[in-house]
Amino acid sequence: MSRGAGALQRRTTTYLISLTLVKLESVPPPPPSPSAAAAGAAGARGSETGDPGSPRGAEEPGKKRHERLFHRQDALWISTSSAGTGGAEPPALSPAPASPARPVSPAPGRRLSLWAVPPGPPLSGGLSPDPKPGGAPTSSRRPLLSSPSWGGPEPEGRAGGGIPGSSSPHPGTGSRRLKVAPPPPAPKPCKTVTTSGAKAGGGKGAGSRLSWPESEGKPRVKGSKSSAGTGASVSAAATAAAAGGGGSTASTSGGVGAGAGARGKLSPRKGKSKTLDNSDLHPGPPAGSPPPLTLPPTPSPATAVTAASAQPPGPAPPITLEPPAPGLKRGREGGRASTRDRKMLKFISGIFTKSTGGPPGSGPLPGPPSLSSGSGSRELLGAELRASPKAVINSQEWTLSRSIPELRLGVLGDARSGKSSLIHRFLTGSYQVLEKTESEQYKKEMLVDGQTHLVLIREEAGAPDAKFSGWADAVIFVFSLEDENSFQAVSRLHGQLSSLRGEGRGGLALALVGTQDRISASSPRVVGDARARALCADMKRCSYYETCATYGLNVDRVFQEVAQKVVTLRKQQQLLAACKSLPSSPSHSAASTPVAGQASNGGHTSDYSSSLPSSPNVGHRELRAEAAAVAGLSTPGSLHRAAKRRTSLFANRRGSDSEKRSLDSRGETTGSGRAIPIKQSFLLKRSGNSLNKEWKKKYVTLSSNGFLLYHPSINDYIHSTHGKEMDLLRTTVKVPGKRPPRAISAFGPSASINGLVKDMSTVQMGEGLEATTPMPSPSPSPSSLQPPPDQTSKHLLKPDRNLARALSTDCTPSGDLSPLSREPPPSPMVKKQRRKKLTTPSKTEGSAGQAEAKRKMWKLKSFGSLRNIYKAEENFEFLIVSSTGQTWHFEAASFEERDAWVQAIESQILASLQCCESSKVKLRTDSQSEAVAIQAIRNAKGNSICVDCGAPNPTWASLNLGALICIECSGIHRNLGTHLSRVRSLDLDDWPRELTLVLTAIGNDTANRVWESDTRGRAKPSRDSSREERESWIRAKYEQLLFLAPLSTSEEPLGRQLWAAVQAQDVATVLLLLAHARHGPLDTSVEDPQLRSPLHLAAELAHVVITQLLLWYGADVAARDAQGRTALFYARQAGSQLCADILLQHGCPGEGGSAATTPSAATTPSITATPSPRRRSSAASVGRADAPVALV
């Protein structure tokens, strides 16, 4: 590197020091070879000789100095930082005469690079600064000192520049030399195991390289980029210090054992330094600095080139230690080094201390810092996290926009739980085994539900406090699977958090994480999966995970799912808050309410407003004034005019949920003739199902009674003309590109009771047809005053209930109900052709460009600029989808307005569902009798426990097995299929009388005597058994029939035995024979003169339970006797309405049918008959036609 003259400059370079512990073995020193001596002489730096009287020194003064330099560099090649002048001369090396022994005391402002004090017995060498040559050193301490050098030859003309006879590079200053006498023979060397250490970061430029001050913060860990020279020198230093000057060197870093010849080949590169103080780049210290300290080298058998082979007898040339620049370090008086130097001396001495022969109190060799705990390791962890681009710790510079929401995650666990490793793996993607003893905070950007969130993670070192419990949105409890104490600590921490937060405050997402990081052969797993899941169940709303930060197992999943739970809980809280804040509509007097009947175009209109006091007349001037001022009002006034047409998008039907809602649930809007609007504004609208795809501007109003209305203009809304409405009870709202919230209602309306209008354009297309089918439709406005219908209306509105159900799905093209349109529903082929027509290009699609232009023009008027028109990603649409699949598209002017509309509609949908009474609850006229029936089922013999696992209080039932099961076994029974087990809930489903009779007649005791007669020594699962054990038992019991009771020894066919059992009304025997009949077809031919089947006989006996069992197990419901009569004839002849209803529900033809019915049609049961009006389809749901077994 060029060392030309230049201004005073300082270069600060951060170096990484690689510390390596090497294995030392005692070997005899090799004899110095001429080639080694020559190589060492070629690589040394030239300088003035310290012994001019010596012949060898006079001839080759540089070679002696080079050899000595190599000897000292093998000991240590580290120096502190210093500033120098570019044109300063290099230090001169001269022999240092002996001086009386006295301690070395650095001058003020001087840093002494004393790195280590070798352990072992006192050495005879000493340090003695003596300006006079000839003194003999007597001190017993020998520090490791070196002069920075490249090891190459010195350019000519650079020697000198100092005081004659001195090695100081500073002119005009005195010289102090430190000389080291040869030490006594080293003690017996010990053998140590070679171990690579960790890296440590150096301090900043002007500070000491030996340590860092407390005010400089934690060190930053960077990549390992140790150069060959530095690594070799440090390894050599380690070798020399550990050996104490004796023994040979065996370094794993390389570069030292090569000898002086290898060093001679090294050449300095531009801008690269091999010393910590850049002294090789800036050799000259500033003027006025103290003289350097010099000391003679000590011969060691570990060096490749010894002084004995290169020098004649005489005083050895000393090695000069350059003092640092003044003012860079505060000095210490009284012979003490600086605090940081002493700390680093202690640190390096502890590393290089031998296990034997060391001073008392020296501990064993420390392991790698990454596997130990301590403040240094914690600082390394913090530095690594700060250096990572994925994590930001306590950073005030890395911020996001205020519009980005924050998710606050707290992490709790004890010191051995592995929570720090979990967080570290999530933030940086790397593994760190250390645990923090202090609370820390982290930040990371995360994508949840397609939206960016800033996740704030707080790692709590101790127990949570009140501030933490109020701050966190979610808490992750972490424990180690191999540590019982950490598992117990989680339970204790959860109790403390619950007491601080209280039961009243909800919305806290919890997660329990078991870490597998420390599990090994020596520390096995002690916390089982069952215990962990039991604790998770006790925490409520908690999810359990097992992670491994070493390999990253489930680490990202934990934080992602916890963040998802927080977002979901927030949405639910916002929805509930919006529902609670719904305004209550005031009650108005009905005296001024004009109730108007509606009709389609050309239909009959009945106006009953004349029977009530009419509203006051409004003049044209007042009308114009009101119309002009309505734009500034939040709710435009309602003008009470004559009856105006407002088409309902849903066909009004008798018995629908919308008509069953009470007046108070509709908003109690009986005074003004119009419901109170909750939200209203202009929106763009287009229908999703009509042919017209153009966007149209509509004035949309959301009413408090659960209806959404839209009109072409605000004037039409004021006059209640040309408007359409939709009942939000049967709809849902969606936003394109967003995942809908997981809001599940307790009960919802049926999807088969709604008829919808396509669009206004479709209504206009069907006007001619509507004119020929007049039908009055009730007013959409709720009122207690219903208009009395005329005779025609009475005739049309009082059809048979079954006929009304059959006609409920048939609509005219406009969507209105018509009693004359009885066309059957379209076949799949017709639907396919209809879809094909819709997918073909039409003329209306050609006008898409014109519609887009209109929409952009409206945006231009709304925004007032062209800024957002050509941005394709700006889409402010939301969709309203009905239960039948019809879609309405609306578009707002901004994201805020769209979100406000969506939130208001969702709140109104939820309010409508909560206020609507279910039809199932309405039809329960005798709930007390049903409760008595369910209690009778529970009182049956053996029904107090589960039939399969013995769990108490089962709440589910298997109908065709006649047994009660628990909720865990019910899921397995559902997987078996309805041909094996028909599952129904005791609490959630209806229980008609025929099903109640089956459950009370059989019971768990009878069922187990049939299906579980001989277990063959197999253990029955208990209530604590796993799902796999339960499933294996249930399938063996009901699917494979392994435990089925054997038949009697009678040789009669099964058909005759079944006939006899039915005739004897033996339910248990019938159930057993039906179970055995599953192995093959059942021969039901008996010697009956009337050719009756067991089903005929059961119907004749009016036995409901046997009739139901025969039908469930595949009896031929259409079988006829010799006179062509079905079982329905015998049931009615016996007067059993329950048996008749069961047969009708399973598709039994009437008793007057022809006997020539085809067997194929007869053997396929289908639900085609209309049940009696007094009974709903109770068993039709369990008597499905997809049962694959036809046994009878």
UniProtKB/Swiss-Prot annotation:
Residues 267-390 are annotated as: Interaction with PLCG1. Residues 931-1051 form the Arf-GAP domain. It comes from Homo sapiens. Residues 676-910 form the PH domain. ANK repeats lie at residues 1090-1119, 1123-1152. G domain binds GTP and has GTPase activity. Arf-GAP domain interacts with G domain and may regulate its GTPase activity. Residues 405-572 are annotated as: G domain. Pfam families: Ank_2 (PF12796), ArfGap (PF01412), Ras (PF00071). A zinc finger (C4-type) spans 946-969. Belongs to the centaurin gamma-like family. This is Arf-GAP with GTPase, ANK repeat and PH domain-containing protein 2. One of its GO terms (cellular component) is Flemming body. InterPro entries: Ankyrin_rpt, Ankyrin_rpt-contain_sf, Arf-GAP_GTPase_ANK_PH, ARFGAP/RecO, ArfGAP_dom, ArfGAP_dom_sf, P-loop_NTPase, PH-like_dom_sf.
